[in-house]
C-alpha cells in the first residue's frame, strides 16, 4: 500500500469495507398476490478475519460478519392485498454498519441464500 493510502479496518484496498450499500429487495406478504420491488440500504462489504496456524482445543477465533450498526424501518403498502388484510410491510434501512459476530437469532449469515430480489408471491412482481 503506498504511503498516505489508508487501509480501512485491515481490509485490503481492493475489497470494500463493511458499509451501507444500495440494494433492491422484494417486499411480500402471504395475504397479497404480488411483490413490490423496493430500493433500500443494507450492509455489505468485507470484515477482517483471521485463521490461526495453531488450532486451539478451546475453539477458533470468532469470525466477524458485516451487519447493522443502526437501522430504521420504512413502512410501505403492497398492492392488491385481500380485503381486510393489512397491506403494510416494514423494510429495514441501514443507517450504519459494523463488523461483529453474526447474531444468529436475528440474521442470516449463510454463504448463499435466495437473494434479496426473490419473490415467492403467486403473481410475482405483477405488471411492470
UniProtKB/Swiss-Prot annotation:
Record's keyword annotation contains Thylakoid: no
Name of the coding gene: LHB
Any one GO CC term of the record: extracellular space
Disulfide bonds: 18-66, 32-81, 35-119, 43-97, 47-99, 102-109
Keywords: Disulfide bond, Glycoprotein, Hormone, Secreted
Source organism per UniProt: Struthio camelus (Common ostrich)
SUPFAM superfamilies: Cystine-knot cytokines
Name of the protein this chain belongs to: Lutropin subunit beta
GO terms of molecular function: hormone activity
UniProt entry tagged with the keyword Glycoprotein: yes
InterPro entries cross-referenced by the UniProt entry: Cystine-knot_cytokine, Glyco_hormone_CN, Gonadotropin_bsu, Gonadotropin_bsu_CS
Entry's localization field: Secreted
Similarity section: Belongs to the glycoprotein hormones subunit beta family.
Amino acid at each position: 500500500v503506498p504511503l498516505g493510502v489508508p487501509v480501512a479496518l485491515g481490509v485490503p484496498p481492493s475489497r470494500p469495507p463493511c458499509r451501507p450499500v444500495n440494494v433492491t429487495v422484494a417486499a411480500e406478504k402471504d395475504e397479497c398476490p404480488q411483490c413490490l420491488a423496493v430500493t433500500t440500504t443494507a450492509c455489505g462489504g468485507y470484515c477482517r478475519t483471521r485463521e490461526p496456524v495453531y488450532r486451539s482445543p478451546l475453539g477458533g477465533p470468532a469470525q466477524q460478519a458485516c451487519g447493522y450498526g443502526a437501522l430504521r424501518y420504512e413502512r410501505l403498502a403492497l398492492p392488491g392485498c385481500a380485503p381486510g388484510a393489512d397491506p403494510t410491510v416494514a423494510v429495514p434501512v441501514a443507517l450504519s454498519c459494523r463488523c461483529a459476530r453474526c447474531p444468529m437469532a436475528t440474521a442470516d449469515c449463510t454463504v448463499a441464500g435466495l437473494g434479496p430480489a426473490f419473490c415467492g408471491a403467486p403473481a410475482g412482481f405483477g405488471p411492470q
